[in-house]
Amino acid sequence: MGAVSAYRKKAVSRIIRPFRTANRYQKMHNDISQTVRRDLLAANGLSPEDLSRSLSAIGTHHVDYADIYCQRTAFESWHLEEGMVKSGSFQIDQGVGVRAVSGEKTAFAYADSLNADSIRRSAETVRVIGAAGREAHIRTPSEKYGKAVHQTANPIHSLDSAAKVALLHRVEELAKAADPRIVQVMAGLTCEYDLIYIARLDGRHAADIRPLVRLSITVIAKQGERREMGSAGGGGRFDLPYFSDKLVTEYVNAAVQQALTNLEARPAPAGLMKVVLGSGWPGVLLHEAVGHGLEGDFNRKETSV
């Protein structure tokens, strides 16, 4: 009985787990949708129904497909050099793009402003790709959700300015402590936060939030009169706490190692030399290295068949 009971529990678990996963994706989708509708659409006096009405106006012409793409991007960057933060910037860009397809023809229109008037005028511009004469239909917006592949927190707000500057100073400290030959450190930290809303002619709507962070490190090593550079870094769709002390140390060590290796590097052999190629793929190398040049000469001299 014990074995049977355990089997039943496993079977029930296999049935319930997909439902739990689906519910989790549904909740994340709802959170994303609400955030994008509030901070992208409503903040600019728009609603999903407004986009559907503009698409309906496009649909009065003979078009096969149309969509409206709304986007807002917030970007922040910090740059450290010579022990101090020498530059920092913050900007917000937003706009809308409208597309219509009729047969093999595609029309685009876009605006740097995001409001009902710019969307209406863009829709009127692209719909001329198709002939007029269809009856207008306003489709009720319906959203679909898929698997969440990254988190949606705003990385710009995940650390305050002092913590971001401290992270860059930490990079410099680690690099100079790694080897006394490191004489200069340059580090950059960038954060991006995209809000996206897409509406299609068939009534399908979709929302997405795309965070992006990157830490870039460049070091200069000096030995005698020779100076060499090394660089490393990384990032992804995370918030800034992703850059743990362990990960930052790995980036720094990679940049330092590259610079120190370059200090010991010698020029590669150059000039005329004998090269022996075996059969098979080396023949391809020979063709790429020599054959294309010969083909070009033949074409230039108009002697090619």
Give the label of every model feature segment.
Residues 2-6, 11-12, 22:
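Acidic, Ala/Val/Gly-enriched low-complexity intrinsically disordered segments
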Residues 15, 20, 24-305:
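Active-site bordering "gate/hinge" segments
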